[in-house]
């Protein structure tokens, strides 16, 4: 990341929002302290976009929302490169570009509450398919705002079952590193990653697939398609091998995880 930002994206800015839950990033002051401790402030500019307020973006064709609350400063930028660590997620089942944008661009106090709680009165009152749809509608607000000036990169490496936003240590990673998926189509990017996970041997994918299916996470993909956000039919191009078109099964051929049976 440091090399990328300094040599290739030296004029770029990382954007963040404060978190909905407590911890080291729930207020702007603590968030900036966390960025400093982790070294980000030493080599790049980080804009906590909801530090100075929020803005509402329209949600085209939304079922749950007509608009979504985002960090106000995000509207200052004319393009967005979405860099995502693809992995499991406590509520989303998996976290790809859709989760990164849907939760990550919604501001910490209003937008994230709209997704997670709605009118339930409970901080985490929304789950399963409804959560996937609300999160996807939030993503739609950001994707529609940037139009054709947005791209998506999913890094399929160190794919833990839980996201680091859970605030607890995840189980040991057993899913092997696969590679990096990039696209101008958010649905194609996330669909390709999911297809690669499913193409893994059972012992390597078991925990991650169980997490995805138990959370109804495929609704992320089907709802993106219903909302016209992208195409789930794609070509997987292997840039390391002469731009050859490959299948998900070919992409994961020969990779091995470190899964060890617990005897049960």
Where are these regions (language model features)?
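Extended, low-polarity segments enriched in aliphatic/aromatic residues
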Residues: 3-264
């Amino acid at each position: 990341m440091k090399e990328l930002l300094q040599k290739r994206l030296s004029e770029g800015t990382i954007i963040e929002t404060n978190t909905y839950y407590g911890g080291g990033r729930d207020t702007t002051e603590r968030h900036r302290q966390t960025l400093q401790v982790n070294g980000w402030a030493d080599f790049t500019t980080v804009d906590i976009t909801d530090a100075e307020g929020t803005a509402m973006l329209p949600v085209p064709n939304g079922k749950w929302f007509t608009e979504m609350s985002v960090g106000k400063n995000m509207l200052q930028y004319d393009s967005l490169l979405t860099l995502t660590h693809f992995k499991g997620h406590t509520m989303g089942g998996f976290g790809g570009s859709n989760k990164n944008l849907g939760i990550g661009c919604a501001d910490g106090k209003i937008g994230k509450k709209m997704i997670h709680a709605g009118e339930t009165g409970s901080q985490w009152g929304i789950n399963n398919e409804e959560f996937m749809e609300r999160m996807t509608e939030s993503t739609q607000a950001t994707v529609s705002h940037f139009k054709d000036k947005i791209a998506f990169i999913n890094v399929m490496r160190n794919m833990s079952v839980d996201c680091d936003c859970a605030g607890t240590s995840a189980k040991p990673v057993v899913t092997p590193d696969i590679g990096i998926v990039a696209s101008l189509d958010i649905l194609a990017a996330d669909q390709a990653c999911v297809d690669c996970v499913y193409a893994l041997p059972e012992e390597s994918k078991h925990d991650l697939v169980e997490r995805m299916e138990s959370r109804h996470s495929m609704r992320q993909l089907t709802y993106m398609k219903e909302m016209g956000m992208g195409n789930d039919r794609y070509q997987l191009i292997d840039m390391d091998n002469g731009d050859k078109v490959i299948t998900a099964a070919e992409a994961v051929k020969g990779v091995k995880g470190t899964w060890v049976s617990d005897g049960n």
